[in-house]
Amino acid sequence: MSISIYEFFHYSLFLGLFVAFTYNKKQPPAFGAALAFWCILLSFLGLLFCHISNNLSNYNVLTANALFFYQISGTWSNHEGSILLWCWILNFYGFFFCYRGRPQSHNVLKQGGYRESLFFFFVLNFVKNSILSLLRYEQESGLKNQLYTPFVLRTLVDSELCSRRNRTFDGPALFYAPLYPERKIKNPLDAWRFRGSREGKRTHPLLHLARDDKERASSIDEQRIDGALGIALFFSFFLLASSDPFVRNFFVCTEPLAELNPVLQDPILAIHPPCIYAGDVASAEGFGLCRSKMMNGIVALHSPPMRKDAAEKNGTLLCSAGCVGSRITSELFTLKFKHVGAKCYPALLLRSNRSPLMLLRRRFFAFSSFWAGARSHSTKRY
């Protein structure tokens, strides 16, 4: 009977790998992450029970004889057990992350509210306030707006208005606003129908910053969660392929063949691997989020609607992503100035742009002094 229980713990690893392969993206991400988490948890508890009960049919238990406390720590004191602990912590973070910050399509409660995540609320609110402060700085300094098109400004204002009134439809209409500002959404019912259309799926990248507090707190989509689940899938496959912790003995033995490593028989070193893994594995979640966010941003910026909009308007996101030098040159050589008349002469043009000229001159002198210093250093050396 005990052999069947240990085999069940062993096969739960294969079940977790099967769930990761056959996960349906139409379902909530927390559903797939929960199944994988519980499967890995059963395997880890099964290996822990093997060490506690001193089951000598397991090879790892046969070579790790020690006291009861170190029998427990012997679960992760070898290569196979440490990889299993790594996979379990990774699936735990994925499950906790999906549960606390589920996407909008799966995060609606029966009361009509949304789950909030304090971390994402703080970060996105900080980014939004930074953008608004940059807007005030550009307005006070009189510089030309490079990032804030009328559509983006209207979106930021609408987000504040939407946060003050209750929604009567499923899902925020602001998030599914199209790239084309000339197409307006008349009522919430049209916005709900517009969600599933092909044009509604191409959203503006800056709309993530323009939603209200509850929407921005729960704005984790499936593609970003799949990046973290893919890392867990790799380690689960590696665990089953080369580091199986449930290897059984082909002979009967009544006493352990070896003791646990004396270096690991220390209270601090016994709890050291779980503490280290808890910090190291958490970085995998951040890596998955950043990777998927960068890929989504690249696809959005190079999409045909975005490139067409960038070619027509000088203040789009693509033009604002340039360096400071491109911004200075665009302000120096453009003919669209408020304080210059219809006949724009070069003298008036340079006079109305003295601050960019000063900045350009400072950078030129800094570069020339750096180049002269490098040449003098090379001549002294040779």
From Swiss-Prot:
Topology in the lipid bilayer: Multi-pass membrane protein
Transmembrane segments: 1-21, 30-50, 79-99, 117-137
Signal sequence region: none
Gene Ontology biological-process annotations: cytochrome complex assembly
Keyword Electron transport on entry: no
Annotated S-S bridges: none
Keyword vocabulary terms for this entry: Cytochrome c-type biogenesis, Membrane, Mitochondrion, Mitochondrion inner membrane, Transmembrane, Transmembrane helix
Major subcellular location class: mitochondrion
One GO cellular component, as annotated: mitochondrial inner membrane
Subunit structure: Interacts with CCMFN2 and CCMH.
UniProt record similarity statement: Belongs to the CcmF/CycK/Ccl1/NrfE/CcsA family.
Miscellaneous comment in the UniProt entry for this protein: A stretch of 270 kb of the mitochondrial genome is duplicated within the centromere of chromosome 2 resulting in the duplication of the gene. The expression of the duplicated gene (At2g07783) is not demonstrated. It is also probably not RNA edited and therefore differs in all the positions known to be edited.
PANTHER family to which the protein is assigned, alphabetical: CYTOCHROME C ASSEMBLY PROTEIN-RELATED (PTHR43653), CYTOCHROME C-TYPE BIOGENESIS PROTEIN CCMF (PTHR43653:SF1)
Protein name: Cytochrome c biogenesis CcmF N-terminal-like mitochondrial protein 1
Organism: Arabidopsis thaliana
Protein encoded by which gene: CCMFN1
